[in-house]
Amino acid sequence: MRIMGLDVGSKTVGVAISDPLGFTAQGLEIIPIDEEKNSFGFERLSELVKQYQVDKFVVGLPKNMNNTSGPRVEASQAYGKKIEDLFHIPVVYQDERLTTVQAERMLIEQADISRGKRKKVIDKLAAQLILQNYLDRTF
């Protein structure tokens, strides 16, 4: 069973995949998207779904710190609905509060990566953290 984790932003989607047993998450890539042009990266996502034989999606929900939902939560849920309809694969949602902050801190403190390079990997690492949190909670 392979699970794909997604960190959906307004310009990119970070992608992570679980190992076949569902114990660990590995960051894969960042897919560029453009919400204004209705370009959501589904072609590339389709290739990854086939390549990894994905059984489930975990989409991060960027709730506010007071547990309320804002426009980004609605956008993530809309993205989840679209991929569920497109791929006929179940989608679950994982609270992703502070995962991007955690990812950035990891890149600064542990990897000493420059700001420019962090921007290129932050969403992939956030997707990995979202998926790993889900795996840790579920399995």
Curated annotation (Swiss-Prot):
CDD domains with a match to the protein in the record: YqgF
Keyword ATP-binding belongs to the record: no
First-listed, main subcellular location of the protein, grouped into a coarse class: cytoplasm
UniProt keyword Nuclease present: yes
InterPro entries reported for this sequence: RNaseH-like_sf (IPR012337), YqgF (IPR005227), YqgF/RNaseH-like_dom (IPR006641), YqgF/RNaseH-like_dom_sf (IPR037027)
Gene3D superfamilies: YqgF/RNase H-like domain
Localization (cell): Cytoplasm
Protein family (similarity comment): Belongs to the YqgF nuclease family.
Name of the protein in its database record: Putative pre-16S rRNA nuclease
